[in-house]
Amino acid sequence: ISACLVGSEMCIRDSADTLRGHFVDGRIVLDERRLSDEDLRQIEKIFVVACGSAYHSGLLAKYAIEHWTRVPVEIELASEFRYRDPVLGPNTLVVAISQSGETADTLEAVRHARSQKARVLAVCNTNGAQIPRESDAVLYTHAGPEIAVASTKAFLAQVIANYLVGLALAQARGTKYPDEVAVIYRELEAMAEKVERVLDQTDDIRSIGRQFAGSNTLLFIGRNVGYPVALEGALKLKELAYIHAEGFAAGELKHGPIALIDEGMPVVVIMPSPKGRAVLHSKMISNVKEVQARGATTIVIAEDNDEAAVSYTHLRAHETGRN
C-alpha cells in the first residue's frame, strides 16, 4: 500500500495550476471556447464521457454540475458510449475528459457526439491534442506531464477543472449569482493548501500502509461524492500496489459485497463531512460498525473536526467548503 505514495507529493502539488487564469473580472473563463453563453443556456442535458480515473472525476462532476445548474447529467464510459446509441442533439453537451487528449475511446465518443450534432467541451491536459481540436470548447488542466505510472495529479486537476465547467455553466445560465461563483472559486483555490496538509501526514500514511502490506484484498466504501473517491482509491491501489481492491457505494454493502468481508480484511471508509451531511454521516458510522462486526479492520478517512468518527479514524482529511 505504501507504494501508492511514491511520487504523489510531487505530482499533486502541481494541480493548483489548473485554476490559474480561469477567473477574470469575476467570471469563469475557459481556454478555448466556441460556445456562447446563449449556447450554454440552451443545453438540456449533459453527458460526461471518459475512461479510468477521468471517468471517476466525471462521477464527482455529476454531483456538482446538477446541483449548480439543475441540468441532468449522465456519466458514460467512453468505450461504451457510441455502442448504445445515446440520445443526442444540438441541445446536448458532451464533456469529454482525457489527460492526454488522445484517448482512443474518448476520441471516438467525441466524434460520435459531433456526428449527432451535440456540442462537445473537452477537459484535457495536453495542448493541441486531437480531442480538444475536435471539440467546440476546451478547458486545459495545465497539470504538466504525468510522471507517475497511475494518474495522480491529473485526477485532482480533472476534478477541479470539472468544477470549473460546472461554474461556467451556472454562470451562463444564471443559476448561481456572481458572488456565489466567486466563493466556490476561492474554495477551490484553497484546495492546494488542504492537500499539502494531508501530505504532511505522509509518515502516518506509510505506517498504515505497512500494517496492511500483506493484505491480498481491500475494499473501499463511500457515499455521495465519497463513492467515486472509493472507486478511485481502489483503482489506484490496483495500479500501484498490484493488490486486488474494489470500491462500493456503502449503501450497497448489504446487497452482496458484505459477503466478501472476513476476519482482518481491511476496509477503507471515506467518511462524509458531519456538517450538512448528518444523515449520510450517521449511515457511514453504521456501515463502519457493520463491517467491523464481521471482522473487518477499518481505515477511516475523516475530517479533522469529526468527533463522532474519532474512535474509528486513522487518517484525518481537512475541512472543505460546501456549496
Name each model-derived stretch:
Residues R13, D17-F47, Q116, N127, ...:
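Active-site phosphate/pyrophosphate-binding segments
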Residues A3, R41-A190, M271-A278, S282-Y312:
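Glycine-rich phosphate-binding loops that contact phosphosugars or nucleotide phosphates
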Residues H56, H244, H255, H314, ...:
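Histidine-centered active-site/metal-ligand motif
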Residues C51-S53, L59, E102, R223-V225, ...:
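Gly/Ser/Thr-rich helix-start
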Residues I1-G7, H314-A317, G321-N323:
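Single conserved hydrophobic/aromatic residue that forms the stacking wall/gate
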